[in-house]
């Protein structure tokens, strides 16, 4: 800068020395903070004074006054001082306040006034509303075009399709300049917020965290996603840095910096400091051809101002360039005035005197200036009827991403006052924006969505799972990389009492992560603070419980009938037996009175019960039913037996061959009604919040949710709820606990269980889905959603699901969850009861037999041995043969073939020669010959003890009976006794009264006694 000043000094001195001889004298007023305006003005005068083609031999002289910023009174004083010296025109570069005061003065004195509006403190300028002249003659010409930033911003937000954004402005910016923009935005339905930024920007952001609640701070973060900065370049740089350092900015933020004056180095500083996308709107000027870049209207401009390679040009402000062109415009007017020979000499004017008349050449000079048309450093300059320069052009720059240069700026479009927008402001395809980027991913361990893989010591953790496979597929398709880490608290995300969020949702809100992936469900509460992609898997809630143990009962054969039925059957058998016994006794009495043969069976009670039991088990009976009453009883019993046995057989077959899970819990309604099993879910999870919302809703008609929530929330959830899903799964495996959680998670736990001891009861109560959570307003959401839909269409997602949830795994989830329609083979335990009954019967029979043997043995030993009254069988046979008819053939019977049985010989005294007749009244004994060769025509006679029998049976008084051999009981209750074979000996026998022996009843049997 000092070198430039030294270079300009000779020319400045030359201008000052010729001032007295020059007829061209102009005045200039600059503010004290605009040092470059002074230097550029002097440089412009020097260039024009050296150009003989414009002013010929005339030279321009000038007088410069420096005033304080925004001091209208001082500006008027200095202007009056210049007018006293005599000036042809006044060139000023001030703010709007000084410009309004100078406008009134120049209009009154008819001094042409070329006004260049300055940016206040580097902030965007607003239009200066100059006061109209009372007589309608405006001598103030605005060299700098009117502010068109409102038009550019409105077109920009329309192209970007913004519906809600915030505009930040500093104290130097006049907010009244936004009135037209706000009016048009309101008509378009745009939600625009305004916020003033103080000079101490760090204090602004610090106060946000102390004055705002978490919910308000989250909303403020959301507003920063779409922001327009009406700040100075330095202020915008500080503002963005503070936003990034305080985590209020994110990668999806879009900053729009609007300022006519910003240099290329300042733009690069903004781009590299900003997090997210940056759009810059600035004013540009058309560049001339290379061979004419320093030539303007036959005027050669100094290379310091026209050559872009010169560093000084980059240091100039737009007001400096318009100031140079204003001097060039005056020189062009002076040139035409001199050529037309219509020159008006300068006049000394006194502003204080009331009698002072305006300059009479002012109108002519003003008209000459208005008719001028030049092409200077700012392009075309000319003035319209409203005394404004209409030509202005803006450049819109946007950030780009490349692997070579990283983040950079490129030209998106231009805007000019004639054609409007030329180009597109739409964001570049997100795929190219994700290419090469590294995203931070937060996750929570949840099998099988995210699990820790086998890691190598010293290297970062590696993860696997269904969600990781989906993320890898998206990263491969979109070309981005990711760094994954676990949420510090291991939670998905729940809103706390202070309206803040924990877990993965909290990481996204605080901008520490770009996206979150795991078994995270899409809920309305979460969607209010973050964005979600399209669901990549459906979601429902299921019940994880321990499989019911198969109950093995050896007496399952009794299951077809209830205990009451078995009791009635057991009672019916003896009742019917007693009835048959009674009817049989009645029948026996009638048989004796009518000399009819009485029944041979069911004569005793236990025999009657035995017959009834045999009929019940379909084994038949031994009695012949003769009476009608007994036939009715037995017929009814047989019909009863048929129905009972048929029903038992059918029900037993169905009970044993068709197996059904003995699980009383099949739905959430069943779970809420039972009291034996406790149940719960993870505290502060999406499932927990769902049950709370449904259970506490007074409009909910289904009382199931109220019952479920009452149990889940018992003691604040501490009794039945768990802190994480792994704990809930372990608790369910132990039994007597039902874990309510995502079906996908519990199904995987059931499929991979070592003992296959748990099952899942699927009963979807919530139609949601799993998605990828992103920061609110993330530009990547639509891209992720599109790729997920493509994975679904191609079937890649189904392949990944089959990988982690195989249909045929080691554990079968359907074996205890649905009714089996196919029969199965009967196991041994199903018939164990039958074999037990048989074994018990056999053991009981053996025990009874042993008891009978022991009883009979003791009875036989206790009885006194008696003499065996022997009969001389040879005499008996001889007597019988003599009584028989002579026509009937007979043979001698061997004494050894005659067996004396069933005689109660023990009742006879040893000295008795003849047994009394009365003792044989009802013995019904018969004597038969057992000769094999004569069995077809053997003769038998009945030995009657009646008085008509006169058969002499001598009994030997001296013969003694050897020891009796006890065999077994006879049918009539006596004991069979058999004497040893003896030689025929004579024995005495008492004749039977009544004569001869009667004929035997049955001739087919031999003679027996």
UniProtKB/Swiss-Prot annotation:
Catalytic reactions of this protein: Ca(2+)(in) = Ca(2+)(out); Na(+)(in) = Na(+)(out)
Variant or mutagenesis effect after changing residue 944 to A: Impairs regulation of NMDAR postsynaptic response
Tissue spec: Equally in forebrain and cerebellum.
Composition skew (Polar residues), residue ranges: 931-942
SUPFAM superfamilies: Periplasmic binding protein-like I, Periplasmic binding protein-like II
Biased composition annotated in UniProt, kind: Low complexity: 943-958
Effect of residue 617 to R: Loss of cation channel activity
GO BP field: negative regulation of synaptic plasticity; phospholipase C-activating G protein-coupled receptor signaling pathway; regulation of postsynapse organization; regulation of postsynaptic membrane neurotransmitter receptor levels; social behavior; synaptic signaling via neuropeptide
Main localization of the protein described in the UniProt heading: membrane
Topological relation to the membrane, as annotated: Multi-pass membrane protein
Signal sequence coordinates: 1-20
Site (Essential for dimerization): 73
Location of the protein in the cell: Postsynaptic cell membrane
Classification via PANTHER family: IONOTROPIC GLUTAMATE RECEPTOR (PTHR18966)
Protein name as it appears in the record: Glutamate receptor ionotropic, delta-1
Organism of provenance: Mus musculus
């Amino acid at each position: 800068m000092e070198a430039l000043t030294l270079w300009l000094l000779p020319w400045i001195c030359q201008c000052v020395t010729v001032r007295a001889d020059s007829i061209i004298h102009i005045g200039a007023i600059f503010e004290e903070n605009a040092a470059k305006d002074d230097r550029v003005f002097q440089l412009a005068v020097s260039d024009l004074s050296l150009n003989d083609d414009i002013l010929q031999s005339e030279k321009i002289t000038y007088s410069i006054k420096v005033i304080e910023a925004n001091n209208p009174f001082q500006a008027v004083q200095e202007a009056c001082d210049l007018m006293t010296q005599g000036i042809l025109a006044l060139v000023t570069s001030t703010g709007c306040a000084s410009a309004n005061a100078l406008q009134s003065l120049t209009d009154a004195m008819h001094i042409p006034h070329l006004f260049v509006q300055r940016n206040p403190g580097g902030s965007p300028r607003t239009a200066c509303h100059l006061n109209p002249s009372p007589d309608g003659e405006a001598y103030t010409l605005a060299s700098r075009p009117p502010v068109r930033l409102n038009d550019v911003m409105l077109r920009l937000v329309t192209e970007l399709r913004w519906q809600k954004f915030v505009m930040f402005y500093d104290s130097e910016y006049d907010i009244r300049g936004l009135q037209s923009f706000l009016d048009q935005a309101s008509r378009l339905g745009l939600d625009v917020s305004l916020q003033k930024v103080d000079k101490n920007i760090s204090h602004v952001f610090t106060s946000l965290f102390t004055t705002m609640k978490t919910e308000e701070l989250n909303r403020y973060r959301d507003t920063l996603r779409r922001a327009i900065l009406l700040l100075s370049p330095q202020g915008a740089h500080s503002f963005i840095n503070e936003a990034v350092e305080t985590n209020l900015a994110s990668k999806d933020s879009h900053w729009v910096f609007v300022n006519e004056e910003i240099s290329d180095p300042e733009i690069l500083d903004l781009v590299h400091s900003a997090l997210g996308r940056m759009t810059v709107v600035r004013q540009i000027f058309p560049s001339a051809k290379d061979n004419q870049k320093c030539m303007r209207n036959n005027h050669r401009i100094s290379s310091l101002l026209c050559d872009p390679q010169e560093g000084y040009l980059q240091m100039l402000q737009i007001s400096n360039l318009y100031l140079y062109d204003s001097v060039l415009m005056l020189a062009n007017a002076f040139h035409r005035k001199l050529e037309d020979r219509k020159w008006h000499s300068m006049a000394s004017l006194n502003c204080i005197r009331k009698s002072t008349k305006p300059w009479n050449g002012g109108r002519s000079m003003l008209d000459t200036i208005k008719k001028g048309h030049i092409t200077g450093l700012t392009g075309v300059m000319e003035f319209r009827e409203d005394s404004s320069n209409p030509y202005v052009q803006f450049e819109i720059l946007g950030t780009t991403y490349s692997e070579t240069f990283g983040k950079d700026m490129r030209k998106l479009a231009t805007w000019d006052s004639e054609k409007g927008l030329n180009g597109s402001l739409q964001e570049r395809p997100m795929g190219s924006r994700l290419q090469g980027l590294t995203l931070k991913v937060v996750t929570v361990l949840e099998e099988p969505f995210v699990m820790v893989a086998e890691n190598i010591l010293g290297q970062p953790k590696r993860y696997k799972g269904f969600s990781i496979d989906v993320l890898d597929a998206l990263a491969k398709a979109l070309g981005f990389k990711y760094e994954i880490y676990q949420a510090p608290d291991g939670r998905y995300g729940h809103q706390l009492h202070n309206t803040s969020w924990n877990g993965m949702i909290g990481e996204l809100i605080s901008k520490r992560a770009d996206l979150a992936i795991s078994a995270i469900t899409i809920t309305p509460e979460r969607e209010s603070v973050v964005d979600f992609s399209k669901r990549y898997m459906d979601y429902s809630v299921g019940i994880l419980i321990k499989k019911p143990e198969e109950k093995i009962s050896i007496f399952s054969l009794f299951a077809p009938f209830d205990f009451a039925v078995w009791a009635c059957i057991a009672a019916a058998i003896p009742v019917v037996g007693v009835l048959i016994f009674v009817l049989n006794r009645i029948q026996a009495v009638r048989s004796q009175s009518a000399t009819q043969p009485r029944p041979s069976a069911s004569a005793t009670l236990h025999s009657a019960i035995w017959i009834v039991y045999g009929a019940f088990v379909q084994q038949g009976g031994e009695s012949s039913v003769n009476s009608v009453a007994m036939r009715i009883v037995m017929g009814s019993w047989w019909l009863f037996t048929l129905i009972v046995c048929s029903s038992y057989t059918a029900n037993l077959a169905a009970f044993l061959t068709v197996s059904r899970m003995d699980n009383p819990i099949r739905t959430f309604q069943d779970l809420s009604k039972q009291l034996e099993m406790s149940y719960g879910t993870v505290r502060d999870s999406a499932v927990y919040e769902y049950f709370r919302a449904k259970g506490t809703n007074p409009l909910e008609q289904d009382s199931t949710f109220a019952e479920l929530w009452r149990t889940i929330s018992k003691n604040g959830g501490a009794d039945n709820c768990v802190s994480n899903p792994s704990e809930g799964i372990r608790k369910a495996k132990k039994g007597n606990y039902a874990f309510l959680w995502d079906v996908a998670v519990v199904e995987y736990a059931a499929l991979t269980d070592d003992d296959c001891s748990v099952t899942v009861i699927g009963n979807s109560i919530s139609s949601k889905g799993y998605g990828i959570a992103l920061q609110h307003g993330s530009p990547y959401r639509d891209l992720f959603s599109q790729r997920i839909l493509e994975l679904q269409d191609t079937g890649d997602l189904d392949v990944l699901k089959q990988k982690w949830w195989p249909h045929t795994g080691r554990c079968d989830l359907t074996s205890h969850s649905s009714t089996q329609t196919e029969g199965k083979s009967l196991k041994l335990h199903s018939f164990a009861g039958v074999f037990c009954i048989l074994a018990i019967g056999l053991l009981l029979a053996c025990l009874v037999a042993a008891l009978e043997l022991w009883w009979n043995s003791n009875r036989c030993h206790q009885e006194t041995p008696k003499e065996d009254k022997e009969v001389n069988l040879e005499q008996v046979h001889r007597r019988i043969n003599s009584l028989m008819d002579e026509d009937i053939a007979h043979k001698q019977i061997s004494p050894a073939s005659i067996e004396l049985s069933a005689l109660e010989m023990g009742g006879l005294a040893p000295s008795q020669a003849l047994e009394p007749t009365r003792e044989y009244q009802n013995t019904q004994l018969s004597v038969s010959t057992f000769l094999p060769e004569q069995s077809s025509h053997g003769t038998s006679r009945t030995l009657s003890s009646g008085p008509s029998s006169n058969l002499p049976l001598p009994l030997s008084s001296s013969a003694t009976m050897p020891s009796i051999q006890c065999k077994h009981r006879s049918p009539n209750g006596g004991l069979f006794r058999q004497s040893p074979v003896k030689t025929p000996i004579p024995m005495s026998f008492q004749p039977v009264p009544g004569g001869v022996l009667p004929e035997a009843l049955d001739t087919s049997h031999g003679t027996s006694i």
